[in-house]
């Protein structure tokens, strides 16, 4: 049954629990991200990469093994965990991933799509 759910509904992968979750008082509310899909927490809030990224890399590969174009990363926690999670998602999904960003003014999440293999002229001027 779980396979049918994951095939049809996008998943919002919350990289680490919201700070304060462990003591029952999360610092912020992520309920608005449910608009984009079912929220799945990958790592505990106290997870850190101190010396060796090996064990967490293995854990993230296992947890993100079904990551697809329709899924999202909700970036939270240790910057090294964020970087590693993006690298793993890119490796699994041919360089493509989407993130959710909270807009403080509009009080809502926005999606941003990335493709690290997107090609353009290297010397091309920024059009931003």
Go through each PLM region and give its residues.
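Short, surface-exposed polybasic-aromatic patches that bind anionic ligands, especially phosphate groups
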Residues: 75
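Long, low-complexity, Lys/Arg-enriched
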Residues: 1-72, 84-128
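Short beta->alpha connector loops
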Residues: 79-81
């Amino acid at each position: 049954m779980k396979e049918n759910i994951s095939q049809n509904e996008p998943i919002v992968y919350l990289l680490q629990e919201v700070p304060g979750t462990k003591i029952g008082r999360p610092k912020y509310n992520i309920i608005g991200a449910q608009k984009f899909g079912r929220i799945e927490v990958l790592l505990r809030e106290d997870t850190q990469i101190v010396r060796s990224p090996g064990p967490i890399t293995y854990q993230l590969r296992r947890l993100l093994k079904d990551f697809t174009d329709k899924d999202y990363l909700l970036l939270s926690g240790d910057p090294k965990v964020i970087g590693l999670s993006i690298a793993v998602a890119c490796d699994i999904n041919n360089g493509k991933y989407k993130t959710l960003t909270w807009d403080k003014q509009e009080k809502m999440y926005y999606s941003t799509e990335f493709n690290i293999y997107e090609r353009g002229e290297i010397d091309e001027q920024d059009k931003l």
